[in-house]
Amino acid sequence: MQTSPLLTQLMEALRCLPGVGPKSAQRMAFTLLQRDRSGGMRLAQALTRAMAEIGHCADCRTFTEQEVCNICANPRRQENGQICVVESPADIYAIEQTGQFSGRYFVLMGHLSPLDGIGPDDIGLDRLEQRLVSEKISELILATNPTVEGEATANYIAELCAQYGVEASRIAHGVPVGGELEMVDGTTLSHSLAGRHKIIL
């Protein structure tokens, strides 16, 4: 079937989004063209500006259009000396939504993966080490994902902290709130048992 080259180009471009296959891309393209051209224009403008203007924070490496992001620039976020290490900027948004953390962050943009040729410098651990040397850090909270690579990355950073006398802690993993034990996998349940705490009345 012969279709508009621009329409084909739009559908192919939409497929760069995660979870969007040919059918989803086709549906999105037709929806924008048929029902929401103004929405499509706003999307195009927002994408163009974001791609051109959003870079990385000079301190924590999260996404920002400024040299230093709002969190790193906030003096109150520096008071407790805590830095939470995460794998991606999306993790910062997740933690910020809890309202439970008032320190700063460091974004790895990935995790250690020797099989894929990703070493310490590739995820910015050289820059993190510089911060351990130059800043007054009371605690590094390791919030990497609970995967094999995430655990290996957390262990590597913990060893780095030990060299500089900085306390390192790992976020707890375990049974989700509202979950049922019979539905939880063995590895998660093992983490829950190992990370149990006393009930204080």
Curated annotation (Swiss-Prot):
Domain Toprim, residue spans: 81-176
Cited SMART domains: TOPRIM
GO molecular function, one term: zinc ion binding
Coiled coil ranges: none
UniProt record similarity statement: Belongs to the RecR family.
Annotated keywords: DNA damage, DNA recombination, DNA repair, Metal-binding, Zinc, Zinc-finger
Keyword field contains DNA repair: yes
Protein name, UniProt field: Recombination protein RecR
Function recorded in the entry: May play a role in DNA repair. It seems to be involved in an RecBC-independent recombinational process of DNA repair. It may act with RecF and RecO.
Biological processes annotated in GO: DNA recombination; DNA repair
Ranges annotated as C4-type zinc finger: 57-72
Pfam families, sorted: RecR_C, RecR_HhH, RecR_ZnF, Toprim_4
InterPro entries in UniProt: DNA_Rcmb_RecR (IPR000093), Rcmb_RecR (IPR023627), Rcmb_RecR_Znf (IPR015967), TOPRIM_dom (IPR006171), TOPRIM_RecR (IPR034137)
